[in-house]
Swiss-Prot record:
Protein name, as recorded: tRNA (guanine-N(1)-)-methyltransferase
GO cellular component: cytosol
Gene: trmD
Biological processes, Gene Ontology terms: tRNA N1-guanine methylation
Stored Gene3D superfamilies: 3.40.1280.10, tRNA(m1g37)methyltransferase, domain 2
Lineage: Bacteria, Bacillati, Bacillota, Clostridia, Eubacteriales
CDD domains reported for this sequence: TrmD-like (cd18080)
Catalytic activity: guanosine(37) in tRNA + S-adenosyl-L-methionine = N(1)-methylguanosine(37) in tRNA + S-adenosyl-L-homocysteine + H(+)
Amino-acid positions noted as binding S-adenosyl-L-methionine in the UniProt annotation, renumbered to this chain: 116, 135-140
Subunit note: Homodimer.
EC number(s) recorded for this UniProt protein: 2.1.1.228
Main location: cytoplasm
Amino acid sequence: MLIQILTIHPAIVAPVFRESILGRACEAGILDLRVVNIRDFALSKHQQTDDYPYGGGAGLLMKPEPVFGAVRWAAGRAPAGARPPRVILMDPQGRRFDQRYAEELAREDHLILICGRYEGFDERIRALATDEISIGDYVLMGGEVAALVVVEAVTRLIPGVLGDLESSVAESHTSGLLEGPQYTRPAEFEGMRVPEILTSGNHGAIARWRREQALRRTFERRPDLLQSADLTPEERRLVEAWRTRQS
């Protein structure tokens, strides 16, 4: 997969692509992560990428010309035989990003993520986008951090990026439930012991315990997720029993 992040601040993004799992996946040829400097496509000699809004108002807006130029250039770098890229505008007005959206994007060949700065975009820039994504109901100083969230969530789903594919499947939200409690050595620490079931060696019982713990944690912390979670009839009865005791 080719992922290009378009930004006026490449130094925010580039170091992340060289580190840890992302860096190793790039070295192995599993991922191709690139940063495109929008300033390189500015038309003025001072590489201006912002200007005052028509009609007045506070702040500055991203100019359309550099962004159009950067996106068109990035789209021309698509891998041979790749489908047209998904062009994603990082925008607090966009669709809320979640695990299912990450799974959808992980099936693509080529992603282009546009990071804004200043007070926002010239409205005409939206014509470039196939998607507009928000990572939450708050405002950041720019789209770079949000774009990196998308990159992390998407790339970890690509085969070979994580050493253990099962770990990506078992994580919170992938199953529709939050992940239950986990423990490592020592078996006892400051009076807190690891649950005996986890040291029993009974893998079937351990799997059932983990599923129930995940269900309980989701019920306690994110009950909204249970509406769309894939639960068995027995699990739904268990949730109803918890609700009854809670009321």
